[in-house]
Amino acid sequence: MKILVCISNVPDTTTKIKFAEGNTSIDTTGIQWVLNPWDELSLTRALELKDDTANGIKSVTVIHVGPATAEPTIRKALAIGADDAIRVNANSSDAWFVASQIAEVVRKEQFDVIMCGIESSDYNGSAVGGMISEFLGIPSVSAVSGIKFENGLPVMTREIDGGKEVVSVPVPFVAIVQKGIAKEPRIAAMRGIMMARSKPVKLIEPVQSEPLTQIVEFEKPAQRAACKFVDAENPAQLLDLLQNEAKVI
């Protein structure tokens, strides 16, 4: 079996975001890009599955839809342990576009397991994995916190309200993973970093697919208003603030 892990290139959470072009795009100047944390955990679990030879996993490939600026993030994934990588040479316009590109690669390369992080830390869309399964007409399982193989079939644990659910689906399938899929992300060793330099990154031009969404405007959240504390023994002050300042009564 072959595993494909979808990875995103996202701004580090300490980055101060600025907008450009009339607040319709993000100013990428000075941004520190990192591997999306959810995808890093997904990759870690994929490598753990491959390490257990009883699972019959022949290879773990990572795929990214984006420009060449994502190369360092792709190389990090290779250093962590992925066997090879695929980069679709296009800007990731929206989830529909990204999913359509990945689905086309899966059709051609015949991957058995497609793993996605439950969301990216920049847009928090949680849409790509489900869309990939719909494009391909294969099962998808969301909120996966555990995955293993028994007799060649996947057995997945997913979080539900009030407990956990154990499900199994036929191969091929999409697993949309979340917290718990791996204890912690695998760290790239020096040997892995050196080997990553020579691992293949296959460059693919995008297939024709138009995004379904258009960004109208970005804006930062409003600053939090100051909080005023009123002594419990002074209800008159509370009433005055509600009437004359907050104007809610």
Task: List the predicted regions and their residue ranges.
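N-terminal glycine-rich FAD/FM-binding segment characteristic of electron-transfer flavoproteins
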Residues: M1-I249
